[in-house]
Amino acid sequence: MPKRILQGTVVSDKNEKTVVVKVERRFTHPVMKKTVRMTKKYKAHDENNAHKVGDQVFIQESKPISKDKRWIVVSSDQA
């Protein structure tokens, strides 16, 4: 099974080798037929502490690194 890749924004880089990435998901509500935005925060491994708050990054699913980390930052989208 392929590993999932998500795009999001770094909202915290205070932890060592860890960033918190906010991923936004949009979908049409099945009853109201209105576009709904939902966000979720993921802790991702950032080996070199290269990413700062506000950066757009891609994260990839991986094996568990710690209690909360199951994602790795794979690349940065400099937009």
Curated annotation (Swiss-Prot):
Ranges in coiled-coil conformation: none
Check the record and name the InterPro entries matching this protein: NA-bd_OB-fold, Ribosomal_uS17, Ribosomal_uS17_bact/chlr, Ribosomal_uS17_CS
Q: Which GO terms describe its molecular function?
A: rRNA binding; structural constituent of ribosome
CDD domains named among the record's database cross-references: Ribosomal_uS17 (cd00364)
What does the UniProt keyword field contain?
Ribonucleoprotein, Ribosomal protein, RNA-binding, rRNA-binding
One Gene Ontology CC term in the entry: cytosolic small ribosomal subunit
Q: Name one GO biological process term.
A: translation
The domain of life is Bacteria
Q: Is the Ligase keyword given for this protein?
A: no
Annotated NCBIfam families:
PRK05610.1 (NF004123), uS17_bact (TIGR03635)
Q: How does it assemble?
A: Part of the 30S ribosomal subunit.
Q: Which family does it belong to?
A: Belongs to the universal ribosomal protein uS17 family.
Q: What does this protein do?
A: One of the primary rRNA binding proteins, it binds specifically to the 5'-end of 16S ribosomal RNA.
Q: What is this protein called?
A: Small ribosomal subunit protein uS17
The species this protein was found in: Mesorhizobium japonicum (strain LMG 29417 / CECT 9101 / MAFF 303099) (Mesorhizobium loti (strain MAFF 303099))
Gene for this chain: rpsQ
